[in-house]
Amino acid sequence: MHTYPHKIENGEGEVLTFLGVVRDRDGDRTEIELLAPPDVGAPMHRHHLQEEAMTVVAGKLGLQCDGEQPRYAEPGETVILKQGVGHRWWNAGTTELRCTGWAKPPNNIEYFLTALFDSMKRGGSGRPGFFDAASLLTRYRSEIRMLEIPAVVEKVAFPVLLPLGTMLGKYDKFKDAPEPVMEA
């Protein structure tokens, strides 16, 4: 567990700040602030067990849900993404995008994104390393899926990379990773 606020950067200009976990009658949620430069955003992905919300503070948010046309949100507008809905977002404006938001329930989103951003930053390519992606996306497959990764990669390449990565010590950094949340 981190001390809050907990700030992470992915090396491409995207900055997430985890503000803490808020408990209320509807359940726990992780509160987050987001900063992203123009044209930066998340690839198409799905949170299997979480609802997510983003409120635009400054800039222009681009959002596309699975099978839908892109839409946009401007300052003061909130977008709520139901669990299980594939989506991607990006800064669709010409200035920095600033959003506040939450993920409910928190599950392992903070750990997952911290490890993913660290891998992206270390790699310097805007993408996580192959071994890190194989480990994180396999471990937390009950919680999140990156929809742009072909099924053949998940079913053929990841199973080859996992034991190889273990032999090479690539996953030592994940030894204290929390257990994945399984659907109830």
PLM feature spans:
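A cytosolic small-molecule/anion-sensing beta-strand core signal
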Residues: V57-A58
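Jelly-roll (double-stranded beta-helix
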Residues: M1-R29, G41-Q50, L63-A184
